[in-house]
Curated annotation (Swiss-Prot):
NCBIfam families: T3SSHrpZ. GO terms for cellular component: extracellular region; host cell plasma membrane; membrane. It comes from the Bacteria. Residues 211-272 are annotated as: 2 X 7 AA repeats of G-G-G-L-G-T-P. This is Harpin HrpZ. Coiled coil: none annotated. It comes from Pseudomonas syringae pv. aptata. One of its GO terms (biological process) is monoatomic ion transmembrane transport.
Amino acid sequence: MQSLSLNSSSLQTPAMALVLVRPETETTGASTSSRALQEVVVKLAEELMRNGQLDDSSPLGKLLAKSMAADGKAGGGIEDVIAALDKLIHEKLGDNFGASADNASGTGQQDLMTQVLSGLAKSMLDDLLTKQDGGSSFSEDDMPMLSKIAQFMDDNPAQFPKPDSGSWVNELKEDNFLDGDKTAAFRSALDIIGQQLGNQQSDAGGLAGTGGGLGTPSSFSNNSSVTGDPLIGANTGPGDSGNSSSEAGQLIGEFIDRGLQSVLAGGGLGTPVNTPQTGTAANGGQSAQDLDQLLGGLLLKGLEATLKDAGQTATDVQSSAAQIATLLVSTLLQGTRNQAAA
């Protein structure tokens, strides 16, 4: 991610003299922005300007343009952009966001920039999908962020099985509608990435993890398992249907089969417990006991292998989500930066 330098010299710009306090309004009163946050706001506003006007080619530029239009400030200059961005940050991240940042300098101010961008990216995830009958829709304007979410899903097929279009990236190209199942999968991905953005925001602020995200954002959360995890799906409680027994039997069979595969691959079953044989009559019981022990060992081995794979999958998914979260933060200003470099 391209960093935004926040050294003191770079922040001493003509725009700094324009808006150091958020304008008072009938509803909010005086600004709660700290001076450190005001400096970050000015720097971001300058990044979003092109030829004296707001450049709405980036995701953050689009969001800010919509906000300014709603307030009757469309087409405004740097003063209006700074004021609108300051207002947007407080709306999305809280009235007291950045209130204690005045003592920060150098790296601390750069961390505040990271907090702002991570927080805004996280808040924007909420608005990527619009609920509709039978599923959800999305806007072409949000494709820079949506495509990165879809790529994350394609990179983790165990967690997000391919849709009928062949890939989640292709799914976004077919039309702007996702059915119920695809919406659930997409929201699961949003939850996981939202958690990573929250972690980045907290880490930059030197805070303990806030958790939360956009719901229960964990790759194995209560409602984010889109792969039908057999450990969760095979419910055998009294409220289940008549198929519970057969499902439980199938689950046990799968564990035993997995355990057998592990043994054949060199896993072993450990050292069996030998029971003295006391004659032919006891041999039948001994054989049954040996079989029970064998099946029990295979079952345990299969369970261990399944849990190990699940743990590795969770680690891989979270690592991938962290990378996508960083890309999303960079994407907020990407349109503006690409044009500036051209």
